[in-house]
Each structure stands twice: as C-alpha cells, then as structure tokens.
A protein has these predicted regions:
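Predominantly extracellular/luminal regions of secreted and cell-surface proteins
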Residues: 484-515
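C-terminal beta-strand-rich structural cap/linker in extracellular carbohydrate-active enzymes
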Residues: 586-603
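Exposed beta-strand and adjacent loop surfaces of beta-rich binding modules
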Residues: 117, 387, 492-494, 505-507, ...
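Sec-dependent, cleavable N-terminal signal peptides
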Residues: 1-19
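Short, ordered beta-strand-loop transition motifs
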Residues: 489-490, 516-527, 579-586
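Surface-exposed loop/edge segments in extracytoplasmic proteins
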Residues: 569-578
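A sequence-level/structural motif corresponding to short, flexible coil/turn segments enriched
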Residues: 17-476
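Proteolytic processing hotspots in large secreted/extracellular or virion-associated proteins
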Residues: 479-483, 513-570, 601
Length: 603
C-alpha cells in the first residue's frame, strides 16, 4: 500500500528524478593584463544563458574592478575594467542585471584623498560604461560596500559600512535610480555607538528594503544581529536585533551574513552566533513583515567547535536552506547544509567532507524549481590542495553528485580567512578578497531555468598566478544507453527506456490541469493525471510503472485498473496496460511516446 498524500498537496510541481549525471560543458579563464592575480567574486546569468562575472584584477601594483561577459558557449563577449580616481585598490563585491541587459557592479574604490568609497557602475549590454556613482562619507573615512540588489524599475540599492570617525562604523544604505542619481541614503548607528556593519540586502514585492549585519550593543552582548526594514522612501520601519545565548566570559559575537525574503514578506537571516560552551553556531531567524520573530534555529555541529553559516535561500514552499561550514575534531571543516520547514523545524542536515578530512568550506547556495539544492565552495583533497567543490542534493538531502575543479597549477596551499556570502541566484557577494596561497576556490554560483549550474572563483594558473575560472555544468537524469531507468521518488513513477541515444532530463508532474478524463472512468488519484516529459532522444519502447493507492477501491476494481496514455492527435486515452502488481500497488504499461498518463478504474 502506497499512500499518495505526500504528493497530492504538491501536484503542480515537476520533480527532478533521482539519478542525475553532471557534465562539465566548459571552463573559461580570465587572466588580467599583467599575468598577475585576478579573483572572481560574484556572478549572474541572464535568461539567454549569458554569464557575467566580476572581481578584482591586479594591474600596475593595484587592483581594479574587472567585469566580463560570456555567451552561453563560454565565449568572451567583452571585458570592462574600472580604476578609481585614487589609482589604488578597487574591490567589487556584487553584480546584478536588469531586464534590458544592463549590468550593475558595486564595491569599494580608493578615492583621491577620500580613502575607500562606495563605487557603483552601470554598463550597457555591450559593456559600455553608462555611469559611475560614488559615495564618500563627509569625514573621508573608509566606506565599504558589501551587497547590492535591483528592483524591477532598475533602481539600485547598495549597503555596507561607513566610517564617520565619531561613532565608528555605521550601516549606510543608498538607493539610486536607473540613471545613477541618488534618491536617498539611510544610516544606522546602534545603541553601543560603535561598529555597525551591514552585510546583506534584500527587497520584497512592495519595494521595502531589508538590511542585515552586525551592530555593537554594548559590553554585555557585544556584536548582535541587527536587521532593518526601510520603506521604498528610505524611512526606517523597524529594527530587529538578535543576541545569542552566550555572555561573559565568552565573546558574545553574533554576526549575520545573509538575508532573503519570501513571497509573503517573511524575512530570513542567517550567520554565526556565539553559543558559549558550544562555540560559534549557525543561527537562523525568521521575522514576519512587521519584524516580529517567528522562529529561530541554531545548529551546533559535532565537537562543539566553529560552525559558520554563510548563505541562505528560501523556496516557493517556504522551506529555508542554509549552508556554510562546520568544524569537528575528526574531519576538520565540512560543508554543512540544512533544510528547515516553514516553522523552523530542522528536516535534514547534509555534510560534505572532501578526500583529505581537512578544510571544506561552502560559500553559496541555490535551489531549483524542483527543490533540489546546490552548494559550492572549496575543498581540500590532500593531493592538489584546495579545489572547487560543487554538490547537488535532492529535496530529501541525499547527495546526488559532486563536481570538482582542479586548476592547471596543482600547487599545495590553503586559502586564508573566513569566506562569507549571500545568494539569490542573481547576486552573490563574498568575504575575504585575496587568499594567501595557491589554490582553487569557488565563491559564487548561479542557476538558469534549464537546470545548468554556473560557478566562479579564483584558480591558480600555469604561469598566470590567480585567474578567474568560470564553469558551466549541465545535468542529465536520462543518460545515453540501453534499458535506462529513471525513478521519481515523489510520485512513485519509474520509467525504463529501451534505448536512449541522446541524453537529457525527464520530469514527472501530477496535475489536474490536463486533458479531460476518459469518459465513464474514475482517475486514481481523483481528477489527477501524470504529465511526463523528457529532453532525451530515445528509440523504441518506454515502460511506465506508476504506484497507485487502492484504499478507495474494491478488489474487483483493482483487478480492472488501466494505465492509459493520452493521444493528442485523436483526442483519445489509449489503454497501454501490460500488467498489475496488486501486492505492491504498481501498474505497468508500454508507450512509444511521452504525454499525459492516467490510472483509471471503473466506478
């Protein structure tokens, strides 16, 4: 007996099938003008599969912004560099795209006598600079951008920290219009009148702006999460603070790294928080649109050591996914990815330990339309030191594949410091700007709607020092071969292809939005049909096996169950039944094409 209650409430979704092959489509490297150090920090992908990467590139003993565009085949279309007026270090932190193909990059740039300033640039689709907007605090202190987001009208929002020399660092959030004109600026100085640093930003559907980071609250709690909501005019609506459970003699640092907002206006924040005896733990919080805490969830990994959450994403069902790394005594640092339900209940934790039982740090996360989870970062394999490591999990937290990238240098080394980042599939920002030694480290990731995965970061080259290394992966759950079997765990459907000559992807949906049911027959489940599609190229027959629920039928009805295939040319439901397994509740049929399928019973 197999109950269908698990998928009846989710019947409109397509689900990725359980066996998936990952294919490296291309790798492109960007080496700046002096064969010196180039580090990709953020990326975005447009609807046509064009890929945009930004980072810092060394030239004449200083770093410049360097932004590149690649087409869907990985061919460079243009590269644009920006050297600020101070002719010194310029560090981009985020990239975003608008609906018209314009590209926006932000970060911090050394000014002419103004130390570091915010520097936001707009390029058109051909890489031609449209405007540069700089922000310098009146005290000429260091102004450092950490994050950016765009709205549908092309307005640009940036946030970070600004040093005013009196109250030290303050949150500083700025809104520009599409022409680069500053519309408003909002600052936040916390109750401790000390360092306050905004690390991430998000928008809701109503134009409200949400910023999070850390704020010094005083000697008792030190740095706390501080999350702020502004309306579209920059007016502060609320501030929500979170202080973890530790206190003296512990450091009591609580540092928020990432934020996202769901379709209902729920606000999710994650980072790391001092737990006292448990050291630093993941701490994830959900607020409603009024800033009222809905739940908080902490994660302490094995060994009561350092657990740092770097990124968060929420799917359309309200499940929250967090990733970062967790330290223990046996395998050092491992990726640790967690799924929470809408009430903050932990559903699963998936860890990834590379080959060396050494340091593995996840930097960013994304979720596809089927709630499969993708995580990237860098992993120590013991032989060639740090490599890119990208992991796919299904919606149950089971590891489906791991893709690693080892650059051409294969030099021993280790990246220095802690990586932090946020992801919303359009924008990624990350922490430490320069690793200390030779390695390959992935910082940023994006997905497209075709299921392709894009990863970028810094990779040590052969005589070129560090280069951008950007990778496109595709996925196939239906690979070439004979008797190829794919199984959907949600709907209990298994397909067996006689021959697949061209690999592709197969999806199964249980839906009420299909052709009318066969006349005079009842469908199982009620009023539902199965829509099955594939992009694979196949020959000969496909066997379809569907699990059914027999709780509302007699034994006589079960013995007459039919599996039917919809034929659009004749508007008929054809009987394709080959056998019934009434012990395991599976019905089988054969078809030469994929379409809508239905399990029917005579009322």
């Amino acid at each position: 007996m197999t109950a269908l209650s698990l998928f009846l409430s989710l019947f409109v979704l397509p689900y990725r099938l359980s066996a998936v092959d990952v294919i490296e489509e291309w790798v492109v490297r960007y080496n700046g003008p002096e064969n010196s150090d180039d580090y990709a920090k953020a990326m975005a992908v447009d609807a046509s599969g064009n890929v945009y990467v930004t980072g810092l590139s060394r030239c004449d003993s200083h770093y410049d912004y360097a932004t590149t565009k690649y087409d869907s085949d990985g061919i460079e279309q243009w590269a644009a560099r920006y050297n600020g007026p101070g002719n010194y270090h310029d560090t981009p932190k985020a990239i975003a795209l608008d609906a018209f193909g314009n590209v926006y990059v932000t970060g911090y740039s050394y000014g002419d006598g103004t130390s570091h300033d915010y520097a936001t640039i707009k390029y058109n689709s051909n890489g031609v600079e449209q405007w540069v907007a700089r922000y310098n605090d009146p005290d000429n202190g260091n102004d450092v951008v950490h994050a950016m987001v765009l709205d549908a009208l092309g307005n640009v929002y940036v946030t970070g920290e600004s040093d005013d020399n009196d109250s030290r660092l303050n949150y500083t959030t700025i809104k520009y219009n599409k022409d680069g004109r500053q519309l408003w600026m909002a600052t936040y100085n916390g109750s401790g009148n000390y360092n306050d640093s905004a690390r991430a930003i998000a928008l809701d559907a109503h134009g409200n702006v949400y910023v999070t980071g850390y704020s010094y609250s005083g000697a008792e709690t030190h740095e706390d999460y501080a999350t702020i909501k502004y309306d579209s005019s920059g007016r502060q609506i609320w501030v929500a603070k979170y202080a973890g459970p530790s206190g003296p003699p512990y450091s009591a640092y609580d540092i928020a790294n990432a934020i996202t907002v769901d379709a209902s206006g729920g606000v999710y924040v994650t980072g790391y928080s001092d737990g006292g005896a448990t050291s630093y733990d993941y701490a994830t919080i959900k607020y409603n649109s009024d800033g009222i805490e809905q739940w908080k969830a902490r994660y302490n990994g094995l060994g009561n050591k350092y657990d740092y959450a770097n990124a968060i994403v929420v799917d359309k069902f309200g499940y929250a996914y967090v990733t970062g790394y967790s330290e223990n005594l046996w395998t050092r640092q491992d990726y640790a990815t967690i799924k929470y339900d809408s009430n903050g209940r932990q559903l699963w934790v998936a860890t990834y330990n590379g080959n060396a039982n050494h340091n593995d740090r996840a930097c960013s996360i994304a979720v596809d339309l089927s709630s499969n989870v993708y995580v990237t970062g860098y992993s120590n394999d013991g032989g060639t030191s740090l490599n890119y490591a990208t992991v796919m999990y299904d919606s149950f937290g089971d590891e489906i594949w791991v893709a690693t990238y080892d650059g051409p240098a294969n030099t021993q080394g280790q990246a220095g410091g802690t990586v932090t980042g946020t992801s919303d599939n359009d924008q990624l920002t990350s922490g430490n700007d320069v690793p200390e030694n030779d390695c390959d480290y992935a910082y940023a990731m994006a997905l497209d709607r075709q299921g392709n995965i894009y990863v970028t970061g810094g990779s040590f080259g052969d005589g070129t020092r560090y280069d951008y290394a950007t990778i496109k992966y595709s996925q196939e759950d239906t690979p070439p071969g004979s008797r190829v079997q794919v199984a959907d765990r949600i709907t209990g459907t298994t397909l067996t292809f006689d021959t697949v000559v061209g690999g592709g992807n197969t999806t199964v949906s249980v839906t009420s939005d299909g052709p009318p049911a066969p006349k005079g027959l009842k469908l199982v489940p009620s009023d539902m049909v199965y829509e099955i599609n594939t992009t694979a190229v196949f020959q000969n027959m496909i066997q379809i096996a569907i699990v059914y629920d027999d709780t509302e039928m007699t034994q006589q009805q079960e013995n007459t169950l039919k599996l039917r295939c919809y034929e659009p040319a004749t508007d008929e439901w054809l009987d394709i039944t080959t056998r019934r397994d009434t012990v395991n509740n599976i019905i089988y049929g054969n078809s030469r094409h994929l379409s809508f399928f239905a399990v029917s019973v005579t009322p």
